[in-house]
Amino acid sequence: MFKVTFAFENGSEVEAFANAGDNLLEVARGANVAIDAPCSGNGACGKCRVQLKGGELDSKKTLHISDEEFEKGWRLACMSKICADVEVLVPDIASAYKSRMKVADLSSKEEIAIFEKAKNQVEETGIQLRNSLEVVELQMTEPTLDDTMPDVERLTRALRKFMNLKRIRVPYAVLRKLPDVLRASKFSVKCVVRVTPDDMFVYDIFDAKEDVIMGGLAVDIGTTTVSAVIINMATGEILAKSSSGNGQIRYGADVINRIIETTKPGGIKKLQDAVIKETINPMIHEMCRSIHLPENQIYRMCVASNTTMNHLFAGINADYLRTEPYIPAFFKTNSLFASDVGIEINGDAHIIMAPNIGSYVGGDITAGTLVSMIWNRPEFSLFIDLGTNGELVFGNSDFMMSCACSAGPAFEGGDISCGMRATDGAIEACTIDKETMEPTYKVVGDPGTKPVGLCGSGIIDVISELFMTGIINPKGKFVREGKRVRHDHYGMGSYVIAFEEEAGSVKDVEITEVDIDNFIRAKGAIFSAIRTMLSSLDFDVSMIDDVYVAGGIGSGINMQNAVNIGLFPDVPLEKFHYIGNSSLTGAYLMLLSTQAEKKTYELAANMTYMELSTVPTYMDEFVGACFIPHTDASMFPNVHQR
């Protein structure tokens, strides 16, 4: 056995032990060291870079590591085997920097404005913002020698009088604390209950003097990023908000790689633990700590995610989603509880899931459609969710059609050498001077934060600016020379946005021709899906009245730059509306309102799903879209290089 030491830039270390021949990336996974590996460790992405600091590794040379970098000790973890005791540095850009949890500051109100807007819009349609949770206050008579009714019977009798319901369920967790709470409170209590037309379920019991908050948890499980809010179920107030990288990322950047991982022994449990134990539960604990709310006072949870993430969250085999005829285990489920899957809130908390529409159009898109309000407008609207599994909806109050395209993780920083989530250190906006070719950029974080990488909105800006200034051609190849443009010995070009001395990382922040090519394919998948769906309805882009854009690619997405690169159709900019993380906002609405929850089920049931792989023209559309902005320039009459 050999000792493997993983060192981090903050000075911390993790030690593990491995046998000769063990793969370094697998050793890291076993030690819960989060090294980014979007390609699931097959050497294709070049993201799992580590630096050899001591000892030896048996490493294959790769195009992702230059000869100079190799001499400095840089290796790909997935291409390295253990052969001796070894110490490696895991740089921030390759490690938990991408998946670092962030609890939002709600004091500015900017973080919660989008939830308030959605709540008001839904309420204007007549949907009531009421749910089935209530706090019931009871004053019971104390037992005597003449009144020896058991405590639980005394409680249910009082509740029955209050609610006039025959069936009242008191779970073991409440029964266990019932005798002490009743006597300490002199039989004056508050109960947190769920009331349906058929029965009542008692979640918790408190002394009547206590202030009781009924907590609710809404979670958007993205393939790359997980976001969550804790709310007051009585008022709808956002109490805490958090985001984190999905712990599953180390098993692959896309759903197919993760499904393949589940076919290995123990794979389903491993993927479920990665999203629940390593991602969601720590987010819950940190949010609860920040607002001084006990975790067991969260009594309801809503999850919105794509179909694969739904299955992996629930610990259900997703392998049948990737093979014909692409059948999921469920579209919706109402029988899941926190204790079933290990979510560390009240064990009896009911988990509702936004309903899936198809094998690759999931609950995230139905939740987002609820927020977009397409279903309540006569105008023709296009809803685009820019995520790893790019999903689209087109329609109005009379009809809606949906489809999904495998855009990959590029919009959230995956498949990009210096890509990252929209968190501290991410370049989220950029301009480039045509004459000097010098960049000016904006970085997420406090003033003075140094750049570490590029998030989705920053990538869009950089590629658009490179094209509009003539630094790259429509194929994404570098055609101008300058101090920030360089080529390696293979002839591969790159543009340096921030040199190492300007950056907050151990290497230059740059974008390469490989990165640009990956992004062109991602944007091509989205645009070709739009064209294919519209063509199937005999529509063209001129008939689109509004475009609603959602996704966690950075709040400052420049719509003109997105049009410049051919991601979005060339329509007037006033038609574009950025609605943020609509999946999370939709989950919030479903959590808060029983009627909104039912409306989401109705939307899913009435939406037509188009399977793009069965449309003969889709691949032709995709090939045409894999240029900047497109092979057919007439589709983008308003895009002109400066």
Please state what every model-predicted region is.
Residues 27-31, 36, 47-97:
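Iron-sulfur (Fe-S) cluster-binding segments and ferredoxin-like electron-carrier domains
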Residues 69-72, 76-218, 223, 272-273, ...:
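Nucleotide/phosphate-binding catalytic cleft detector across ATP-hydrolyzing
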Residues 219-223, 228-256, 320-335, 367, ...:
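Glycine-rich phosphate-binding loop of actin/hexokinase-like ATP-binding domains
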Residues 247-289, 415, 426-431, 518, ...:
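N-terminal phosphate-binding loop and adjacent alpha-helix
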Residues 295-306, 463, 541-551:
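Short glycine-rich phosphate-binding loop at a beta-alpha junction
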Residues 306-320, 491, 539, 551-570, ...:
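Short glycine/threonine-rich loop-to-helix capping motif typified by GTGT followed
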Residues 396-398, 539-603:
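Catalytic phosphate/nucleotide-handling subdomain of diverse soluble enzymes
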Residues 467-537:
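A contiguous, well-structured pocket-lining segment that forms one wall/lid of small-molecule binding clefts
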